[in-house]
């Protein structure tokens, strides 16, 4: 145990990505992890909690339900729904898996459905890393070290659009802004917006972070309800808030942790709570101080607008550790209902089942 209501389990592999298996009505009892930096022995693993009991101790340690070997380091994991999950690796490959069976069933397992080999490669067929993937309805977007974006139709299982030479510096992360627009970040503190309905050589917007320091953008998150607000994490630990209606940087937030942010995620139902993890081993909860809200002021912004008001961010932002710093990179986190899971380079996964919101 590392903190109140938080449990840790050492699984013997560095965890690069972790994701809850989605559930609509109840708290999920299954999650997947992807490992990295383990030579030729990296895996996608499916884990199950023993129950949905309120007593967290009864859920831990989680049970390993299935394991699938991966060709290289796992770089991203994205669920399409509660059955299908896409996994990318540093060998330029993306695979689609189906989770068959329910938790605690003796037949639960992971089955490969489709594989897209060498989506990203250099000249002469040399494989390169698929840096990130994003999912929107029936489309899958990938970016790689070859400065290329692939758009895959999940209906046909084919690459129906490939955009090359999209950046002059390494791409770091990608997300769908809308069903027909993808947004990618690079190591020069830039974001590029692509409209998939127009000619593939035309860029919709080239958005610069107008600061003197070109700090790499390392991760990206979209506001759950106000999709035009984009949040980016930087190599120096700052969070930028962008309004994609005007392609402008509204404000920058800092927690005092100057290590690179590895992931950002909003609570899906309580968007005034955002979570981050970092290379420095901190898992943080960024929240509006509700007690400071001017309830007598009918013109006061709702909680969902808190992030984009510079004055309110400065006076009402609360940043707290979810777990005690572990001083080893925390690479990934995910939130589902009131429970959070994260994975780190110390070969451990951490679970907190009762988030304080």
What are the roles of these predicted feature ranges?
Residues 26-32, 83-86, 137-141, 179-183, ...:
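Structural hallmark of WD40 beta-propellers
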Residues 49-60, 96-117, 144-171, 177-181, ...:
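Per-blade loop-tip surfaces of WD-repeat and WD-like beta-propellers in eukaryotic adaptors/scaffolds
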Residues 8-10, 66-69, 121-125, 163-166, ...:
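Surface loop/turn motifs at the tips and blade-to-blade linkers of beta-strand repeat domains
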Residues 331-357:
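Blade-level signature of beta-propeller repeat domains, shared across WD40, Kelch, NHL, RCC1
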Residues 1-9, 26-66, 99-112:
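Beta-propeller domains
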Residues 35-36, 88-91, 143-146, 185-188, ...:
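Conserved strand-to-loop turn within each blade of WD40 beta-propeller repeats
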Residues 13-22, 72-79, 123-135, 168-176, ...:
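Canonical WD40 repeat/beta-propeller blade segments in eukaryotic WD-repeat proteins
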Residues 56-82, 119:
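Blade-loop segments of beta-propeller domains
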């Amino acid at each position: 145990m590392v903190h109140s209501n938080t449990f840790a389990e050492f699984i013997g592999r560095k965890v690069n990505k972790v994701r809850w298996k989605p559930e609509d009505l109840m708290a999920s009892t299954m999650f997947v992890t992807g490992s990295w930096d383990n030579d030729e022995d990296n895996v996608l693993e499916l884990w199950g909690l023993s129950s949905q009991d309120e007593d967290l101790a009864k859920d831990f340690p989680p049970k390993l339900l299935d394991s699938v070997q991966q060709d290289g380091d796992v770089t991203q994991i994205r669920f399409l729904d509660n059955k299908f999950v896409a996994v990318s690796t540093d060998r330029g490959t993306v695979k689609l898996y189906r989770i068959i069976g329910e938790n605690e069933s003796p037949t639960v397992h992971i089955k490969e459905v489709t594989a897209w080999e060498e989506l990203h490669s250099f000249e002469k067929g040399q494989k390169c890393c698929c840096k990130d993937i994003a999912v929107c309805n029936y489309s899958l977007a990938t970016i790689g070290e070859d400065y290329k974006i692939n758009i895959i139709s999940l209906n046909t299982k084919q690459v129906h659009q490939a955009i090359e030479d999209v950046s002059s510096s390494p791409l770091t992360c990608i997300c769908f802004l809308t069903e027909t627009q993808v947004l990618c970040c690079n190591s020069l503190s830039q974001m590029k917006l692509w409209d998939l309905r127009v000619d593939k050589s035309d860029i919709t917007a080239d958005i610069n972070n107008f600061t003197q320091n070109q700090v790499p953008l390392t991760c990206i998150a979209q506001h759950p309800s106000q999709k035009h607000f984009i949040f980016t994490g930087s190599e120096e630990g700052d969070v930028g808030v962008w309004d994609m209606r005007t392609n402008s940087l509204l404000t920058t937030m800092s927690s005092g942790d100057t290590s690179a942010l590895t992931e950002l995620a909003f609570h899906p139902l309580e968007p005034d709570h955002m979570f981050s993890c970092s290379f420095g081993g901190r898992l943080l909860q960024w929240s509006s101080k509700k007690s400071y809200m001017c309830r007598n002021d009918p013109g006061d912004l709702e909680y969902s607008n808190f992030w984009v008001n510079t004055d309110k961010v400065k006076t009402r932002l609360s940043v707290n550790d979810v777990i005690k710093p572990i001083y080893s990179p925390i690479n990934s986190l995910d939130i589902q209902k009131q429970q959070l899971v994260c994975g780190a380079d110390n070969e451990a996964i951490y679970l907190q089942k009762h988030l304080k919101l």
